[in-house]
A protein has these predicted regions:
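Short, surface-exposed beta-strand/loop micro-motifs that present aromatic residues
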Residues: 321-323
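Beta-rich carbohydrate-recognition and catalytic domains
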Residues: 22-128, 132-243, 247-314, 325-350
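Bacterial N-terminal signal peptides
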Residues: 9-17
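Bacterial N-terminal signal peptides that target proteins for export
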Residues: 1-9
């Protein structure tokens, strides 16, 4: 019996080793030598917080672009979406200080100022930009999130504010906007009741993966997304997925993500088989892609459990992965030291 047990354990160990070796070959990230690309000190307009990068190659039909590449990002408590531009993804990146898409022009605005008593959980902001380049209609579609309360001001008391929001069905939701130049955006009325939306196209739909790993979909990128199942349900990262980056390879979706409660928070990757009905989609056990190892990622700080929400001091965490692909080359962008900057890495996905 002991011999059979030993053989079984050895077999499991071999399987784990082979699985680990395969995973290591599947995704490899090599940091850019120019890191960090942006920090909170890059511009006074950044307000001490940088997170949620999204990078695009500026389309040829945009007149007089600021640069070849645009990076949209946010201050977690910010009043507008930030924009940086460069002629190479390695930089140098320069901040377009006026920014784009102010919160006052979205559904996430209300009479100001916000009550000081509620600022820990309730604050007027616009963040987590996701951008789709639509070459057929020569437009950019941007999705952003913020507190949606139908323009109403919440109660001054934090406990009453939370109860009020729950009773009214309010929350941090998503709205879409359009632009022909990447700088001037016009919002569209529909609201999707999810936040941190990332989008990919497949089988005639625009599919979304949002905070906590929640799925959604729509035929029209400007419409409200239908909320569906969660492929991370019943797994080790159920209700922990923070922000995702998405890559489609045929009928396989690669989901890069970081998780609330990890120590340290780091970039992981799971895959989802898209061939079946979306109600049956499941995320595979994740592999590690990148964790804080460099000084600009605060690797010299103590390891602590990450928490939900914003973080206004440097911490040993990397967050908010985004994958940009151009001419067969994938690049991973991510937030450093929690929410103190943006760095990048070249990446191979097999």
């Amino acid at each position: 019996m002991k011999r059979h047990t030993a053989v079984w354990v050895a077999s499991l160990a071999l399987l784990a080793h082979l699985t680990s070796a395969y995973a290591a070959q599947e995704v490899r990230a090599t940091r850019l030598g120019q890191n960090p690309l942006i920090t909170v000190d890059t511009s006074l307009t950044l307000g001490g917080n940088v997170n949620g990068p999204t990078v695009i190659r500026v389309p040829d039909w945009v007149d007089r672009p600021l640069g070849r590449y645009y990076m949209y990002f946010a201050n977690h408590l910010g009043e507008f979406i930030r924009l940086a531009y460069a002629d190479s993804i390695t930089g140098p990146w320069r901040v377009y200080e006026p920014g784009v898409l102010h919160v006052r022009d979205t559904a996430f605005y209300r009479p100001q100022p916000d009550p000081k008593e509620t600022l820990a959980d309730f604050y007027t902001h616009v963040a987590s930009p996701e951008v789709l380049v639509d070459p057929d209609r020569k437009r950019l579609v941007m999705w952003v999130h913020g507190w949606s309360t139908n323009g109403e001001r919440w109660p001054n008391d934090p406990v009453k504010a939370l109860a009020w929001a729950r009773q009214a069905g309010y929350g941090q939701f998503t709205q879409a906007a359009e632009s022909t130049d990447g700088i001037h955006f016009e919002v569209r009325p529909p609201i999707t009741k999810l936040s941190y939306l990332r989008v990919f196209q497949h089988d005639g739909y625009f599919w979304g993966v949002s905070r906590l790993g929640q799925l959604s979909r729509s035929k029209d990128p400007l419409a409200s997304f239908e909320v569906g199942p969660n492929p991370f349900r019943d797994g080790p990262y159920a209700n922990r997925v923070r922000h995702v980056g998405l890559v489609v390879r045929g009928s396989r979706l690669h989901v890069f993500f970081t998780a609330i409660g990890d120590a340290p928070e780091r970039v992981l990757m799971s895959t989802i088989d898209l061939t079946s009905d979306w109600t049956t989609w499941r995320a595979s056990p994740p592999i590690e892609v990148l964790q804080p190892e460099m000084r600009y990622e605060c690797a010299d700080m103590a390891v602590t459990l990450s928490e939900a929400g914003d973080v206004d001091v440097p911490v040993r965490q990397i967050r908010d992965p985004f994958v940009f692909e151009e001419q067969g080359q994938a690049s991973l962008f991510y937030s450093t030291c929690g929410e103190q900057g943006v760095a990048g890495a070249r990446m191979t996905i097999r």
